[in-house]
């Protein structure tokens, strides 16, 4: 147990031993299981004791019938596992797509145990290899590197019985995700150039490829040269003439974000000024 001298123990088998009594005297060993209210004779060998509180004393009787008693020895036999309680991650800011998955950018938080057996000793353990090995750690977790962390608490009662909490898993991820490449699917790039994205086409789709698996994608559009951005959909339909900037924001499970390169589209369905055609340098001979 926690103390090596308190005689609170898991040990159910031990012997009574008396030394220094009067030579030739008779010794009677007594035990009480009700805090000394009643006593029963017992043997030197204590074997397979049930959990409980045991008081022991020896009564020494000399040849004349005089008696004396030893001091009482108290033993608490306890083989019951203690309440382990519940381990939580106090102050953890669970960033990202889910607020309950404990995949996070947060590198600083505390371990917190509640509901464990009163008077027990708590040891906090951490594993960084998916539970193959465990090392002792502290309540305060600070400046953690990116990685997968598993935590548990081992609760030890006064008799040395132990129990463990459920494991808490935390994924610390501060790395920006792959944004991938944003393209304009089905865009018909009309006009003089087939690659300048100046077009009469008012209907096309946004398409993102190569982004981090499992990430969340938000598509944004700007119609004021990037000063402000609004969320938009994949399908761009019946656009008015104007300049459109598009980008995709990729958010991973931990809440890290990255942006694609901007795609610029100029929608122009207005007929150009035709101007006036003349015949320059024409020598208009004849009557008129």
Give each language-model segment a name.
Residues 11, 20-26, 106, 115-121, ...:
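Short proline/glycine-enriched turn/loop motifs at strand-loop junctions of beta-rich domains
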Residues 34-38, 129-133, 224-228:
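Asp-box/BNR beta-propeller loop motif
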Residues 45-53, 140-148, 235-243:
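Surface-exposed, short loops/turns at beta-strand junctions within beta-sandwich domains
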Residues 69-94, 164-177, 182-189, 259-277, ...:
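Flexible, low-complexity linkers/stalks enriched in Thr/Pro that connect modular domains
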């Amino acid at each position: 147990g926690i103390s090596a001298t308190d005689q609170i123990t898991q040990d159910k088998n031990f012997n009574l031993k008396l030394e220094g009594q009067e030579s030739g005297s008779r010794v009677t060993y007594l035990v009480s299981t009700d805090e000394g209210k009643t006593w029963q004779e017992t043997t030197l060998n204590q074997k397979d004791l049930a959990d409980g509180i045991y008081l022991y004393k020896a009564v020494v009787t000399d040849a004349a019938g005089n008696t004396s008693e030893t001091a009482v020895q108290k033993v608490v036999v306890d083989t019951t596992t203690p309440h382990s309680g519940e381990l939580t991650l106090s102050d953890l800011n669970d960033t990202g797509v889910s607020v309950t998955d404990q995949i996070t950018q947060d590198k600083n938080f505390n371990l917190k145990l509640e509901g464990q057996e009163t008077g027990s000793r708590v040891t906090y353990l951490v594993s960084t290899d998916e539970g193959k090995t465990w090392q002792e750690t502290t309540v305060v977790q600070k400046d953690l590197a990116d990685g997968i962390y598993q935590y548990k608490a081992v609760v030890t009662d006064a008799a040395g019985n132990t129990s463990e909490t459920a494991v808490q898993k935390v994924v610390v991820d501060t790395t920006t995700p792959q944004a991938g490449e944003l393209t304009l699917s089905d865009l018909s790039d009309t006009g003089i150039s087939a690659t300048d994205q100046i077009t009469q086409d008012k209907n096309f789709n946004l398409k993102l490829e190569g982004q981090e698996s499992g990430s969340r994608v938000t598509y944004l559009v700007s119609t004021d040269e990037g000063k402000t951005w609004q969320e938009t959909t994949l399908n761009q339909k019946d656009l008015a003439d104007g300049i459109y900037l598009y980008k995709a924001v990729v958010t991973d499970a931990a809440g890290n974000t990255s942006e694609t390169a901007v795609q610029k589209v100029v929608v122009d369905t207005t007929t150009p000024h035709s101007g006036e055609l003349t015949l320059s340098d024409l020598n208009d001979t004849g009557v008129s």
